[in-house]
Structure formats: C-alpha cells, structure tokens
Regions:
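Residues forming the ATP-binding cleft of Hanks-type serine/threonine protein kinase domains
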Residues: 86
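Basic, Lys/Arg-enriched alpha-helical interface segments
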Residues: 1-66, 75-81, 90-93
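Acidic, metal-associated active-site segment
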Residues: 72
Length: 93
C-alpha cells in the first residue's frame, strides 16, 4: 500500500470542500477512492480516472462526484500524492 502525501494546496481545497456543498458526503465518497488508489486497484468506471496533459502531464484525475475532481500523482512506487480537489472551474480543467 502506498503512503499518502497531501500537498498544502490539497489541504486547503479539502478544508474548503468540507465546509461547502459536499460537506455531508465528502468523506464517504473520497475514502474508498483513496484506499483503491493507495492499493493500486482500478477505480470504478464512474470515477473516470484518466491522465492529464499540458501543465498537468505527470498527474491523473478522477471524479469523486460529477463536478468534484481529485488530481493526484504517483511519483514512485511508494507514494500517492494528493495535489488538488475541487470543481472543474476551480481547478481550471
């Protein structure tokens, strides 16, 4: 299982989402995704996990909810780095 690292921006994004629209379901939706990513298990197709391009070329994103996106990367075999969390417009996607 990979060790999970949170960037400072992810921590701010998570705190914002915990107070916002997704406050009641954020943890119940996010924790199973994080467990699957940390264990290198495939995500369900509804999460639309895919690689990003351009400035985000070494990152991937998946949909926690239809307009709640998790950007992450796996820099090596032991680490899962959580980079951003937010809507498409907040993240500039």
């Amino acid at each position: 299982m990979r060790r999970i690292e949170n960037t400072a921006q992810f921590k701010r994004d998570y705190k914002r989402e915990r107070k916002g629209l997704h406050r009641t379901t954020l943890d119940t939706e996010l924790i199973p995704i994080l467990n699957a990513l940390a264990s290198d298990e495939p995500l369900e197709s509804r999460h639309r996990d895919h690689a990003l391009t351009g400035d985000w070329k070494d990152h991937r994103d998946c949909h926690v909810k239809p307009d709640l996106v998790l950007i992450y990367r796996k820099p090596d075999e032991a680490v899962l780095q959580l980079v951003r969390l937010g809507s498409h417009s907040e993240l500039g996607l």
